[in-house]
Design a protein with these regions (language model features):
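Long, positively charged, glycine-interspersed low-complexity recognition regions
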Residues: 151-225
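SAM-dependent nucleic-acid methyltransferase catalytic core
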Residues: 16-134, 138-143
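Soluble or luminal CAZymes and related metallo-dependent hydrolases
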Residues: 94, 114-115, 150-157
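Conserved SAM-binding loop
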Residues: 12
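Short alpha-helix immediately C-terminal to the canonical SAM-binding loop
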Residues: 9
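Glycine-rich phosphate-binding "P-loop"
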Residues: 141-151
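Short beta-strand "acidic-cap" motif of Rossmann-like dinucleotide-binding folds
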Residues: 1
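Conserved SAM/SAH-binding beta-strand->alpha-helix loop
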Residues: 5
Length: 225
């Protein structure tokens, strides 16, 4: 697993390799607390990348801030706390439950290494004829909703890198005009996949809707993805 956002990579590292200690730290905080939210924002901001993975305290604080907001996509001074007033189960508690779920533990248990590198570095390091890369970049023209490490020009750079690899790739995107130029349908395999996504709700009833993602591959899969 690789993520250029050090905080996200650190969360995965702690979840995989320090799960028990990480869960203990997460459970030591209340599921909602406005004061703690503001304190952790001051501790975390400004975001400083490149620290050594395995920092449980940074992982817990980052998750706490992310799960107390509406979008949970990027953290800044403008990030606002959302008070559920005890009416609904918090996203923070949902995340703890997920980390404790045996199915999730089995899933992330398949991760053997966590990297915090650029896509160029990872491709150069791992590319072989037997490698399969699953690539999930930020949405095109929505990079600012994430963090600042991946700019708009890097979408084209990523496309050029993928078109020249020895191995196989699955690229997750949504449709935008440049994609047909970068990955012509006659040369690359395009398919769509539905997924469930949680809706914002004002009731205790959990609701979901169906979303759709585009998958582009430099091979034709033997099975439907």
């Amino acid at each position: 697993y690789n993520d250029f956002n050090t905080y996200i990579a650190n969360i995965f590292h702690c979840s995989v390799f320090k799960r028990d200690q990480f869960l203990t730290k997460l459970k030591s905080y209340p599921s909602q607390d406005a004061g703690l939210f503001e304190k952790f924002k001051k501790d975390i901001l400004p975001l400083k990348y490149g620290f050594k993975l395995g920092d449980i305290e940074k992982a817990a604080k980052y998750i706490y801030i992310e799960t107390q907001t509406f979008s949970g996509m990027t953290i800044s001074e403008k990030t606002k706390y959302v008070d559920l007033k005890g009416k609904y189960k918090s996203k923070y508690q949902h995340l703890i439950d997920k980390l404790e779920n045996p199915k999730w533990q089995l899933k992330i248990g398949n991760i053997t290494n966590v990297e915090n590198e650029s896509f160029e570095t990872v491709i150069k390091k791992y590319d072989t004829p037997d490698t399969l890369f699953y690539v999930d970049p930020p949405y095109y023209k929505m990079e600012d909703y994430y963090t600042k490490e991946f700019g708009r020009d890097q979408h084209l750079q990523l496309a050029n890198e993928l078109k020249n690899i020895k191995g196989k790739f699955i690229l997750s995107y949504y449709v935008f005009p440049q994609l047909s130029e970068w990955f012509p349908k006659g040369k690359y395999h395009w398919t769509t996949k539905e997924f469930s996504k949680a809706n914002s709700t004002t009731s205790k009833k959990k609701t979901t809707s169906r979303g759709e993602e585009l998958l582009i591959m430099n091979f034709k899969p033997a099975l439907t993805l």
